[in-house]
Structure formats: structure tokens, C-alpha cells
Amino acid sequence: MPEDNLSGDGGPPVDIDISVEAGDWPDEAGLARLVDRAVDAAFAETGVTGRSELSVVFSDDAHIRTLNAEWRGKDKPTNVLSFPAFPFAQGGPLPPMLGDIVLAAETVSREAALEDKPVQNHITHLVIHGLLHLLGHDHETDAEAEAMEAIERAALARLAIPDPYA
């Protein structure tokens, strides 16, 4: 069984605030375990060290659609959005607050069903994906997408979760 604390420094790299605001999600304690493991795995793969804070909001399609329209000009729900609190340059020091990751219940569940994977695995992947955005990664170009997906695959492999891109 993979260890829950993969950062190796005796504690989690970030103080995580979890909020279940809307939608049909697993219990909050289960979500907290998924998020903790996802964050530890992402930090282990990126080599980022230090301490920070992170907010993860579990919401629904209606809420994320509003956020997506307001912040990205896309009037439709999406699976995950990330909102950095401060600019973060890869290789730089962690800011005191990384930002917010927001997930949408209906979209996450629908995608997991379509891809025939456990919803917990999909949640874990999306938390890692959202966190990588907060850590300065993106997927606007093919090269960026390949680099980001490689980190996601490696972080998920640490947790014995199959490659979501296979």
C-alpha cells in the first residue's frame, strides 16, 4: 500500500481546507483522504518543497458553469477549475496560499462512468491536475500538455491508479 505522506518531510506540504458545497460526493472524510494523497503524490513528482495553503471545493455543475463563464468566458460546466491566489513560477518558493481547486459533481461522475473508472480515481486525477495548474503547469501547447500529463501519470502511479490517458 502506498504511503499517505509521500512528501518525506514528516507532514503534508500544504494545509488543505476542504469544503463540500453542493453535489453528490463521497463522504467528506473520504474526500479528505483522496485529496491528501493526491497532493502528496503531486508534490513528490514535482519536487516542490515548502509549506502553503490550498482550498479544494466540491461543488456541482451549476456552480462551476457560473465560474467557468465568469473567469474563462465558457458558458458550460467543466470537471475542474483552478484559481491561483498568487502567481507561482516553477522552481520558485511556494506562496503562502496556492489557491482554490473547484470540482463539479455531475461532470466528474459522468466522465468517470464514460471512462469506466472508479469516481475516486477520477477525483484524485483532477485534484492532481488542478494542483499542477496552481504550481505553474499548463497544457496550452502540445509540449506543455505532454509534460503535465507525464507528471499526472507518475503521481497517479505512486497511488496505484491506472494511467487516465491510456
Curated annotation (Swiss-Prot):
EC number: 3.1.-.-
GO annotations of cellular component type: cytoplasm
InterPro entries on file: MetalPrtase_cat_dom_sf_prd (IPR023091), YbeY (IPR002036), YbeY_CS (IPR020549)
Top-level EC class as recorded in UniProt: hydrolase
Residues reported in the UniProt entry to bind Zn(2+): 129, 133, 139
Cofactor(s) in the UniProt record: Zn(2+)
Gene3D superfamilies: Metalloproteases ('zincins'), catalytic domain (3.40.390.30)
Subcellular location: Cytoplasm
One GO-annotated biological process of the protein: rRNA processing
Pfam families reported in the protein's UniProt record: YbeY (PF02130)
Principal location class: cytoplasm
SUPFAM superfamilies tied to this protein: Metalloproteases ('zincins'), catalytic domain
GO molecular function terms listed in the Swiss-Prot or TrEMBL record: metalloendopeptidase activity; RNA endonuclease activity; zinc ion binding
Domain of life the protein comes from: Bacteria
Cofactor note: Binds 1 zinc ion.
Keywords: Cytoplasm, Endonuclease, Hydrolase, Metal-binding, Nuclease, Ribosome biogenesis, rRNA processing, Zinc
Function: Single strand-specific metallo-endoribonuclease involved in late-stage 70S ribosome quality control and in maturation of the 3' terminus of the 16S rRNA.
Family per record: Belongs to the endoribonuclease YbeY family.
Protein name: Endoribonuclease YbeY
Source organism per UniProt: Mesorhizobium japonicum (strain LMG 29417 / CECT 9101 / MAFF 303099) (Mesorhizobium loti (strain MAFF 303099))
